Amino acid sequence: MDQKIVDALAITPASSASERTIDITTTGAKTGSPRRIEIWFYRSGEQIYLTTQPASRSWYANLLANPAFTFHLKNGLRADLPAWAEPVLDPIERRRIFSDIVADLNQPLHRGYLSQPVEPVEDWVAGSPLVRVSFPESLS
């Protein structure tokens, strides 16, 4: 993978909202049509994840039906990356990942656009969509 892309994906808790804001294009679960939305991405360990605050989301339903999608970097570096979504369903794994994400969101720099503290980890585990993102070997 190009080093500029690796750097753009290497967010930390100190990363700004714009650094973690991307678009994704999924394939509609019912329509088969492309659906593009804006979303934040997160890191836990060396992995990249997509999630949102607890709620039902159409992007998640789309990825469950069609896990291939496009991950659009758009702030600073612009790149359209073929990607694959794998739902994270194991409660223990979800708790570990959401603990990292909630700690990230509760950083002081996010106070301007997020009510803090965000929902408790258990609320995220019980009600938030969570997918692990991988990129095809062709990007390597």
Please state what every model-predicted region is.
Residues M1-T21:
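Extreme N-terminal tail/first-helix region
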Residues P54-L139:
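Short, structured beta-strand-loop surface elements
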Residues T12, T21, R43-S44, R78-L81:
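General secondary-structure edge motif
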